[in-house]
Amino acid sequence: MNIAKHRKERVICMKKGVFAAVKKDGSVYYRASITFRCKHISLGSFTSEAEAHGAYQSADKLLSATVPITPEDYQETQFPLLPFSKWISLLNFKNNGIYIKTPIYLRKKYFQYYLSSEETLLFDVDDLFFYSNHAIMKRGGHLFVAEYGMQTNIRSRYGIRAYARKDIDFTFVNGNENDYRYSNLNVLNPYHGVTIVHDNGHTEYIAKLHLNGNYLIGRFPSLIEAAIAYNKAVDFACMHGCTKQFPQNYIDSLSSKEYLAYYKKITLPDRLLSYRFS
C-alpha cells in the first residue's frame, strides 16, 4: 500500500479534531487537537481514529461547559479518553487564562501539581516557571524531574540532601508531605557528611567521610563545626591523591575569618590521617 496515498485518503475522512500521521515503520496513528482562545492544543496520540475523536469530544465538552468546573469535579467517566494531565491543563487554561503543558492548576499565591486525580503537590508561585517546563515523575516514593540529561530529586531544590531523613534532617511543618511550599519546609541539616543524633535529650553532630566505608571524623557540639570538619577531611583526601569527587558544604552564615578559625581548630582523626589513598 502506498502510505502517502493511504494517509491522504484517511485525512479526507477524518473526524473533527483528528488527523493521521505515519510512523517511521509506515504504520498509521492518530493525533487529536483542539483550538481554544486562538491557541492550538495537542491532546495526544492514539491508535485509532475513534479514540482520538473521543479525546477531542471530551476536551470540547470541558472547554464549552457553561457551569463552573474545578479540579475536584473530575470524573473519568465524564471525560473518557482524555488523559487526566491534559484535562487539568485545559481546565487551568479555561479558568485561569494561562495554558501550561504540565498538569498545573493555579491557586491564589500557590499552585497544585497533579501527579494523578488523587495525588497533588503544592508549590509556591516562585516555582511556577520551573515546573511549567519540567514534568514530575514518581518512582519508589521519590519525586524526580529530568534535568540536563539526569533525573534530579525535587527535594534538592529546597536544600534537602538525597539521603536526608524526615523529622531528623528536615520536617514538613504542617505534616503534609506533598506540600513543598517554602513556609512548610524546615531544613534542619543541609550539610553533606553530617548526621544529627538525638539521645536522651542530648543532641550531637557526627561528621563522617565515605571512603571504603564510613570514616568517623568526629563528634561535635554544633552543626556548623561538623560541616566544617567534613570539609577539612575532604580537603585532606583530595590533597593526598583521592580521586573521588566529594561535594563541599557552603556555610553562608560565617565570614571567611570565622570559617578559618573553626577550620584550624578541628583535628582530623589518626585513622584518616594514616589512610592510603593510592
Model-predicted segments: where are they?
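Boundary-flanking segments of nucleic-acid-binding domains in nuclear regulatory proteins
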Residues: N2-S278
